[in-house]
């Protein structure tokens, strides 16, 4: 790899990071607008036209707030915790493909030594396995935040969140095993390519896996109706009760990054990813562009689903949450692996 290739990869990574941060910023605005609509009010509309500068105002607010440390906290761990959550969220995003390969012009091929531009930072053979491994490490950021804050509400929220994430990683992972069996690969690009003729959602094991995945996805991202770790009526705001200013912003952004990443993953696993439906424009030079448009449309639907569910459904009790994961989802996930194994034989 020469210096031009390294520089090109760094520029692409920086562009992806900028897109993700911008998407997260406006996702927060979208959530407040949707909440306002559901609650029959306007939502934020003072910063810029129709409130479009509200994310910028929020960012300035977080950056300029005074940094306050509670008494008797472990400062090193207290500061490391939000950094762990943010780092895991960014690294998980790195293996998500946004589209197919785009042919590069000849002059750029000479400069970079690359024939195509991959709309993905990295494409390891372990793909989906890498994504879930990195996502599971975010648990450490949460439990460290709860312990280092020297606050009972924070610690209880961290313990709840850790138990919840560990419990729902099992059905989440096992639902993906069914899709890996159907597609024969761990790479997200290969899984998307295997759905050219028929999306996985229209296959029996794929449909069952989708139902399991969506429920576990809400639990893994700590969103309603599974936000027991941040239950305002019980725990103030849970594990980040003692966090403010930019430190809180890191937790906040990481949560929205995880929601966007999960929306991308569910699209890639079950809804054909960036494949254009019915084989339209197959082999056409504009296929990657239209594929990106279709992919973003599907992702927007699932990001909206996160918001709609949050503001319309009540919260589970903690015992109901754990019972659903261990007694309902896991047995169904195991059964679905068997169904997928039988399905590919016929």
UniProtKB/Swiss-Prot annotation:
Transmembrane segments: 6-26, 76-96, 128-148, 166-186, 198-218, 260-280, 289-309, 324-344
Location of this chain's protein in the cell: Cell inner membrane
Keywords per UniProt: Cell inner membrane, Cell membrane, Membrane, NAD, Quinone, Translocase, Transmembrane, Transmembrane helix, Ubiquinone
A Pfam family recorded for this sequence: NADHdh
EC id: 7.1.1.-
One GO location term (cellular component): plasma membrane
Biological process (GO), any one: aerobic respiration
Top-level lineage group: Bacteria
Topology of the protein relative to the lipid bilayer: Multi-pass membrane protein
MF annotations from Gene Ontology: NADH dehydrogenase activity; oxidoreductase activity, acting on NAD(P)H, quinone or similar compound as acceptor; quinone binding
Catalytic activity entry: a quinone + NADH + 5 H(+)(in) = a quinol + NAD(+) + 4 H(+)(out)
Subunit structure: NDH-1 is composed of 14 different subunits. Subunits NuoA, H, J, K, L, M, N constitute the membrane sector of the complex.
UniProt similarity note: Belongs to the complex I subunit 1 family.
Function comment: NDH-1 shuttles electrons from NADH, via FMN and iron-sulfur (Fe-S) centers, to quinones in the respiratory chain. The immediate electron acceptor for the enzyme in this species is believed to be ubiquinone. Couples the redox reaction to proton translocation (for every two electrons transferred, four hydrogen ions are translocated across the cytoplasmic membrane), and thus conserves the redox energy in a proton gradient. This subunit may bind ubiquinone.
Name of the molecule in the record: NADH-quinone oxidoreductase subunit H
